[in-house]
Amino acid sequence: MSGELVDEGHVLAARLAAHRLRSPDLPDVPTAVGHLVAVQGQEFHPALWGLTRRLRPDARPGAAGAVAACDRGEVVRTHVLRPTWHLVRSDDARWLVELSAPRVHQANGTMYRQVGTAGHVAETDLVVAAVQERPRTRRELAGLLAAHGRPLEGIALGYVLMQAELDRLLVSGPLDGKQQTYAAFDDRVPTGYGPLGERFDRDAALVELLRRYLASRAYATVKDVAQWSGFTLTDVRHALGLLGEEVVAVPGAGALEGATLWRLADADTRVLDPGPFVGALAPDGDPDRPVVDLLQSYDELFMSYGETRALVVAEGVDLGDRLGSFIHGLAVDGVVVGRWRWVVGARDVVVEPQWRRAPTAAEAAAFDEQVAAVSTHWGRTART
């Protein structure tokens, strides 16, 4: 184990810097997705907003530009790692799905049996044939099945479609207006296994996943990795063993005393000395000035960690405690202290906070700066 010690302050700063939520320097949305490997994405537009926060300010494409990267197929949305939507680069999709499909199928087993997924082979064949003609919305697919005398809807349809995604038959297509579509997997995903080459190897895939996870998440425990990835503790320890001298075990201090955290042996300065990076989001670069982040409800700053997630949550705040449509996380200096929501209209966007404590004047001003960023992102007048 390394002789260095890391406390909660260092780990939080390193995570903010590694996630590129401080001193953001990534050039485009696909690069940001690839940096994070997989980004939880059932909240589609908020997830894209979160990705654009990790780009250089002069490289941020706005909402329409972020969607365009998905429409072009540079980024796709599918079920990987855990049984929920994630955004991934199209050239990572094949190996990520093949790696995680057995675990997700296992997690879905009870629901598969409940809705009778195994008995819906004909329905799957109809869906696959339809998307080979052109991308289809879920509503279109439901209508097509009904027209063929095989109606499916609700949860049953959802699990049939998810199983087809995990079997590498379906993946997201371009938006149809405001609606998501399904497309043929091979039409949107390149052949081969991206960084793994032409053949899939499970050990190589686990190593690739863990190496890239640590590069973008800084420090994490074995349980953090397992909870994020959906793999077992045994799988994670096996991957760490395969990485060998490429990773370093670091003992925690302070609130992390007793924990063993892992980082890459060649971790960059953002991880080893994050101080110079973490105050740079403020216009004047003053590290003592509070920085507000408007984070989507499933931002990777939260979802990447289970065991040590409390580092980013203020005392008395529960990430699962969502009041109405205020589902997103309002953070000050990387720690969630409230909720926020946006309501996007044709000409304006309303941004509303729910502070769980009274903000200081400086924090309120920092929030207003982020409201202005939302206005720019959507190309609409902002109201609060």
Region locations from a protein language model:
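Phosphate-backbone binding and catalysis cores of DNA-processing enzymes
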Residues: M1-E153, V317
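Short amphipathic alpha-helical interaction segments
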Residues: R60-A68, P151-Q163, L233-L240, R322
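A short, conserved structural fragment
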Residues: D71-V80, T84, E165-L175, G244-G252, ...
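Short, cationic-aromatic polyanion-contact patches
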Residues: L87-A93, D176-L196, L256-G279
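Short, amphipathic alpha-helical interaction segments positioned at domain boundaries
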Residues: E98-G109, D186-L209, D273-G285, V292
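Positively charged, polyanion-binding regions of nucleic-acid-associated proteins
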Residues: A118-P135, R202-A218, L240
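Non-catalytic regulatory appendages
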Residues: L242, E246-E315, D321
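Glycine-rich, small/acidic residue-mixed loop/short-helix segments
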Residues: A314-T384
